[in-house]
Amino acid sequence: MEKNKDCADNHCMTLSPASPLLSPEEIAVRAGQQIPYLQLPARASVFAEREMRLRQRAAAHPMRDFLLFTAELAHVQHELLQSYPEVALPDAEALHAAAHAAQAPLPAAGWPRDGAWRSGFRNMLERLLPRLANSPAQAVVRALSQLSDAELEYQADCLLQNGQPDLDLAGAPLIAAALQMYWTHMVLTLQEARGTARDAPFGRTLDVTRCPCCASLPTASVARVDGSGGHYRYLHCSLCSAQWHMVRIKCSHCESTKGIHYQSLQPVTANRADSSAGGSPHEKENQPAVEAETCDECRHYLKIVRMERDISVEPVADDLASLTLDLLVSEAGFQRHGVNLMLLFGAPDSEGGAR
């Protein structure tokens, strides 16, 4: 393994080239095995699991307060999603048109949002405020609660339409949280209503780098573990939490299979000890569950969280808890492909979407 000398916060970044062998997905496809293309979130657990992982990762973490704030937000998201009101959904004609064009049926940038999402946003703030005792975030919550419908819709447009300059970065995670509830509810309700129909509401789309349900960018990819022990890579949607299959060792931005590398963080002390001893005998068992998959062709990257190394990984939580990796990979000249709506920073990517 080649050791990269970039270091930050008592961690060094290691660089591993991708294996030239066929990925398990490619082997399965060649053998005729059907891999589910789409994994939809579970209403009862999607935000609850995120909250649990955020609390787990917050322990002794430099970003403890922010991770715990995001955990409180996920708690309220979970509560409200269980009894979300009815909202307008695409009819059969609209679904057929989207399928015929190989487009997402609930596009984030163009969907006419139901006013119920604004009610959900205000209910979320009302429930969240008492959970933020003595937190600086209380001021942001109170300020957002004073937004008019027009102001709130404008901020939502800025957020969903590629991070326009007028976006309020302090309030964006809270607005995003309400939009996540709304889009997750729409996806699940539409699947429940029409999932057994001959023409399923969601399928493959032309742009495989974006969510087939809402056309949003991924937050990260996740190497899932199935019942037979297989490991399959899925991209995790930043907005609706749907996951769609993409074979491993393939760039999630340009789709190249050349020049793919995996970069990860190791404590400096352990890194030096392994180097002097020629590698730890337990190195494989101690491999980090979060890596950055980088592409030499387009100079983009996306994190991957690996369930085979830590069954508790959750893409949004583990992405937030590994920002040091983002900093080091960015310093190496790579640009992030995906987005985490809980923490927006930097300028919009040329492809669209705030980083």
Question: Which residues make up each language-model segment?
Answer:
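A subset of signal/propeptide-processing and intrinsically disordered low-complexity segments
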Residues: 1-6, 277, 281
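Generic recognition of cysteine residues
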Residues: 7, 12, 158, 213-214, ...
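A short, highly charged, low-complexity intrinsically disordered segment
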Residues: 11, 123, 127-130, 135, ...
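Cys/His-clustered metal-coordination modules, chiefly Zn-binding fingers
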Residues: 189-274, 278-328
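Long, contiguous alpha-helical scaffold regions
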Residues: 2-94, 304-355
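N-terminal alpha-helical interaction blocks
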Residues: 37-198
